[in-house]
């Protein structure tokens, strides 16, 4: 299905991604973990064609992606939707209009300029928002929503493209644990119910283990781990993050229980 072969990206004399190879044969939820600067975001941007590879190739269902241009490239970006850490919504625009922006690649210039949306698309946008539990916010400005709600709007916008792949670049990095859980559960349901491939850059081990079928670890631009969640031991995590024996998974956790326990320990220590 999706094949990434020896993909490399250089910025001047700095190599951000080095000979990354990855095969996805069937729809799955794949998590990519690693410390900041490991090359996770650069890899996703190359898959989406937001950035060009220096070397290597990407193919999907036998079609070469790295050489696509113009209309064909835009069509691929509709098939391979992307959501970001900072949501990338239009703050003063209402929620449903932000979702409808997912159809821009297949609309005429005139329709885009005058915000002319077919009624069928409007109904579809509201149905998607309802599926994600935020239909009641459809007429509100995006800026009035919480971070978790805004990320679900961004997911809804991606679903308007009816993509085969969703790329999520640190989708929960700026969210509190409860909203992070809601967003990850939404992405997991989309994979399971729709049969879509979801590839998510994550910075927490517990999240990768809980929601992903497969986990890839990146360090210094290279893929250094590719396996099942249960194979992601603390020792393997140390190798991925380049950490020492004092490495603590709790420090990277988004689990509500773990964070509450950590806060309790800090409070207790303050009275010792």
Curated annotation (Swiss-Prot):
Signal peptide: none
Keyword Nucleotide-binding attached: yes
Enzyme class per UniProt: translocase
EC number of the protein: 7.3.2.2
Catalytic activity: phosphonate(out) + ATP + H2O = phosphonate(in) + ADP + phosphate + H(+)
Swiss-Prot/TrEMBL keywords: ATP-binding, Cell inner membrane, Cell membrane, Membrane, Nucleotide-binding, Phosphonate transport, Plasmid, Translocase, Transport
Stretches assigned to the ABC transporter domain: 2-245
Pfam families the record matches: ABC_tran
Residue positions binding ATP: 34-41
Function: Part of the ABC transporter complex PhnCDE involved in phosphonates import. Responsible for energy coupling to the transport system.
Family: Belongs to the ABC transporter superfamily. Phosphonates importer (TC 3.A.1.9.1) family.
Subunit structure as annotated in this protein's UniProt entry: The complex is composed of two ATP-binding proteins (PhnC), two transmembrane proteins (PhnE) and a solute-binding protein (PhnD).
PANTHER family referenced in this protein's UniProt entry, alphabetically: AMINO ACID IMPORT ATP-BINDING PROTEIN, PHOSPHONATES IMPORT ATP-BINDING PROTEIN PHNC
Name under which the protein is recorded: Phosphonates import ATP-binding protein PhnC 2
Organism: Ruegeria sp. (strain TM1040) (Silicibacter sp.)
